[in-house]
Amino acid sequence: VPSFKRDFDKLFNPKSIAIVGASNLPGKWGFMMSMNVVGGGYRGKIFMINPREKNILGFPCYPSIKEIDDEIDLLVVAIPASKVLGIIEEAVEKGIKNAVVVSSNFAEVGEEGAKLERRLSEVATAGGLSVVGPNTMGIYSASTDLCCMGAPVYPLKGNVGFISQSGNLGIQLMAWGQRRGIGFSRFVGSGNAANTDIVDFLQYLGEDPITKTIILYIEGLKDGRRFLDAACHITPHKPIIALKAGKGSQGQGAVLSHTGSLAGEFKLFQGMMEQTGIIEAETTEELVDLAAAFSSLPVPSGNRVGVMTLGGGWGVAAADAFDREGLEMAKLPQAVIEELDKTLPSFWSRRNPVDIVGNVNRANHFKVLDALASADDVDIVISMGTLLGRNFWVENMLKTTIRPLINMIRFHTLRLPRFELSILKGFREALSRSKERNPEGSGGINPNEALQWRDSVFVSHLRDLMRKEKKPIITVAVNEGERSASSLMRDSALFTAATPERAVRAAGKLATYSRFLSNHSNKARSSNI
């Protein structure tokens, strides 16, 4: 437990930053940190510290922090390890309360480095200076556009707070998150955690008003009891999702060589997660999925799922995963069946999953979703195969029309007139049938119906439906899996899974958190009796 009061508000919302080791040379850590702070849009005061330079990136240079008359809220250190202690001593003398030490070669490299790190911690702690690192990739804060990181990643702004014991992995996951449309409020790579650890930042994010969901990448804990107490305080009002590294003996060895920390017994940590309501992510991919789901979807009231599919196979793939994830296929009430009888063909299955049997009328898709989401017996809705992905029809029409035409010209030139006539005849017949279905119309394709197939219309309907029913609706896109899911999430701020299994997995984790909240609420009520 720290012997001094942390001032993380100034860490994440600094009015001034001094960068020791700032450089004009691309490839140096001092250059990358300086470039990202400036390029990220930070608008506070920036002081570049380098006795060998007159200016860096257009900013005047100072030989040391002693030469700066202004108050410094955040010190960034990117110099060799042997020189860091002297800078920390100067920072304490100046009254600086927060430092990000990017420099490596401390406890992660052996006993000599560990001794230097212990001395750094002693000096900083005695002076009331909170050190992020050493051996960190830095921090990010949406509220001040602060991209104080060692890689050119500029996250989307949002409500996800991220604490990672691997800065490299953390920044990579934020880059993936950016492509998926996930917005971040804060990020901190804790590094070797000389005198601040994951619990300090967890406590801060638990009270942080702009952070609604917390995700963690954890390699080891210095104080399990303190972590447990912090998590117990946070999870009843904010979800925490954790990926624990070092599950096996080989992983534990890798953790020790990475940050110099002990990974600990994984089963013990799993028990801690169950006790505190922390949601476990088993892979980096799942951590990103769950960050997207929890930050964009309401928490369900139970585990009963209504499924709408464009074809039967989608429903089977999803149902296979239900038992693994603790989900229940909702039983459709008679009122819902009768409502769907008005919309779907007479041969539909009249059960969940609701297979819309290739129905291409977009209005009918909306009616099925509305019926499922409004049913009291349904807590979560999964829609599969009805969200197409940006430009799906245009791209595929071009692919399926132009390529055969080219091949026809190349290999069957003499048959080309007959080929063209066949296509024209087919179009004429389609228009004729459309006229029969809609005798009062123009005889062509209904423009309003065509417009409803735009993803933006579908997504807008989902968003309104979720607001109305306060239930999560998860979609699985047809087109190109991960790429399509990423673009749709980025454009719509909704959770779109790349596969049925990942959709069900996310639904299961939402239901698990719902069950925890329900149990916690019951315990709280019991304690007040």
What are these regions (language model features)?
Residues V1-I529:
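Catalytic-core regions of core metabolic enzymes
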